[in-house]
């Protein structure tokens, strides 16, 4: 099995786009890329825009040759109705989606999911609602958790976690569980016993606003439990990489992993690259170059459509 992170915060954008290849299947998870509309009360910097444009091209190119596309929920850094990533990527693909009607918040149920489904209408070879189901595709098993909360607050909606297995190993893609602040977030991982997990990490950059201290502490404890679950590799990237001090936040997880011989890494480091932290350094970027960014029309429309 081969795992290739395509776009993540440690690669310079908001995304969790990941390519997973088994012996007989190529699966693309959450093919979307976005930026923070505002951070430190600043719009995206030109370096962020350029990086998004670069990775969008990579993502579209990767999508041409995949068999399966998975959409874990309907936030714009996980799905795209055509703002940045053209919906033609879904042509002739088997597409697994989060249930657009059940266990979903109102903004996704009544606006984002319907718009997305209209945008890809008649393009996939088949669309399957995936929540809580298991599918055999060739010699590959793709399992989905029941919908679990998007972090500690159900008002942000629900996501489905994904386990992809071949005869050799299993990888879990947690989607946006925000570092597992609820015990229900752990159930799927304990059932599937993966060798590799891709997890987003807590919203520590919003501590004191959206995230409570006790929720952060619970997320870290639960991530420690995940590391103890027989894993070989943990890729922690997405929400927590929006915090410039992410390594300090994750130190207890790193320490336990080191004791157990588990590799913990960002998506960039997994690819043997230095993390390219842009959003968390936006103030610094504007101090270096204060010119307003040139936004492509699609990206401008995406950013005006709202965060998440």
From Swiss-Prot:
Disulphide bridges, residue numbers: none
UniProt superkingdom: Archaea
InterPro entries: Metallo-B-lactamas (IPR001279), RibonucZ/Hydroxyglut_hydro (IPR036866), UPF0173_UPF0282_UlaG_hydrolase (IPR050114), UPF0282_hydrls (IPR014426)
Family: Belongs to the UPF0282 family.
HAMAP family assigned: UPF0282
Official protein name in the record: UPF0282 protein M1425_2116
Organism taxonomic ancestry: Archaea, Thermoproteota, Thermoprotei, Sulfolobales, Sulfolobaceae
